[in-house]
């Protein structure tokens, strides 16, 4: 009942709460001379202006901060990103989970640092819903760090920008002890699903060369709905109910590569199309572009269609930002991949190719949990307890698989030793609805098995 009441009043109440958007917030602007700072340095910090919450899951936590962090774009040009640090009750300062949300937008005002706060636009609904994945991490007593990995230009799908931002966010978190109490030798696990897996995967692959000093901190990365080929995802989504992802991706690439934008603009009669591509978050983008064909069919917006990939400029951009093509980049940390066999948005074939590349490259530990009955959307939920099990095992010092291991199950709910994590996952979701505090060993309203049963069966 509390949850239903929350759903009813939140849109009204949130409309009365003024939360400055990143485009109008001076905090997002780096100070003069920031270029001289080292990547990962904290340029400025503050407590989050509003509480961390999802429209469906208000988070009762100890504290939260925003750090403005020195980073750089795909070409090595200095920039600054904001990362959000969330502290649960009774937090363990030696354990940090870097969670990369699936922002999937080319619009700066959709950034996680904004979307995760109370009072953010309804258009950021997808990010707000991801608090269900953040909450179980907080419940374990882990600090959660969530970076605006797309950077100030909102470069959705761009690999180096995203991966470097994740690593620089972690660097900053480990330097933030005087602000957050996180230890500089804290252990860190990365996690991301879909668009968040793109950023997390690139971070894992770049870490040995870009941030070798983090090798002693990083325990591994969990990658779900793993995006390794942005073209394959665009081809799968174009002309479908998920065509908005294509629009947002085109906008994100154009934000990093002006030449990409010029080539596509010359291939359409709709010259203002790119003005629209960077004006949506994920949720409203999907709604506004349902069944739109950008590069497919007779009524496509871009005349050349998929033959546009024959342009050497376009082909290079696509290859540079597809992790599946980067055989030379092999993670040195343990990796857990979970993916649905029938994923219709992120085809599993490219995940298998990346798995093969990394195995042939000598990766020390790569576990691939293939779910035989779930697609992209359902695996978000079904695969989460498996990822949580794997993450908890990493922090508890349990042994990872040696070498490469690919297991296909009917469902990832059948992942080994997952039962307690399934209970934790859904119990914490219920905790958030009841506004119970999140953290290790804290007093809460008692949740009975009957409460959990009602929640799972939709009886609330």
Swiss-Prot record:
**Reported phenotype of the disruption mutant:** Results in reduced growth in lipid-containing media. Leads to significant less virulence in a murine intravenous infection model.
Which keywords has UniProt assigned to this entry?
Disulfide bond, Glycoprotein, Hydrolase, Lipid degradation, Lipid metabolism, Secreted, Signal, Virulence
Q: What class of enzyme is it?
A: hydrolase
Where does the record say this protein resides?
Secreted
Induction section of the entry = Expression is induced in medium containing Tween 40 as the sole source of carbon. Expression is up-regulated during the yeast-to-hyphal transition. Expressed during experimental infection of mice. Expressed in host cecum and infected mucosal tissues (stomach, hard palate, esophagus and tongue). Expressed at all stages of mucosal and systemic infection.
> Which chemical reaction does it catalyze?
a triacylglycerol + H2O = a diacylglycerol + a fatty acid + H(+)
Taxonomic superkingdom: Eukaryota
Active site (UniProt) = 194, 343, 376
GO molecular function terms listed in the Swiss-Prot or TrEMBL record = lipase activity; triacylglycerol lipase activity
InterPro entries in alphabetical order: AB_hydrolase_fold, Lipase_secreted
Glycosylation sites recorded in the entry for this protein: 229, 291, 417
One GO-annotated biological process of the protein:
lipid catabolic process
| Paired cysteines (S-S) | 110-281, 359-404
What EC number(s) does this enzyme carry? 3.1.1.3
Q: Which PANTHER family match?
A: LIPASE 5, PTHR34853
Q: According to its UniProt entry, what is the function of this protein?
A: Secreted lipase that is able to hydrolyze both the neutral triacylglycerols and the monopalmitate ester Tween 40, allowing the use of hydrolyzed products as carbon sources. Acts as an important virulence factor in mouse infection models. Has broad lipolytic activity, which may be important for colonization and subsequent infection, therefore contributing to the persistence and virulence in human tissue.
What protein family is recorded?
Belongs to the AB hydrolase superfamily. Lipase family. Class Lip subfamily.
Q: What is this protein called?
A: Lipase 8
The organism of origin for this protein: Candida albicans (strain SC5314 / ATCC MYA-2876) (Yeast)
Q: Which gene encodes it?
A: LIP8
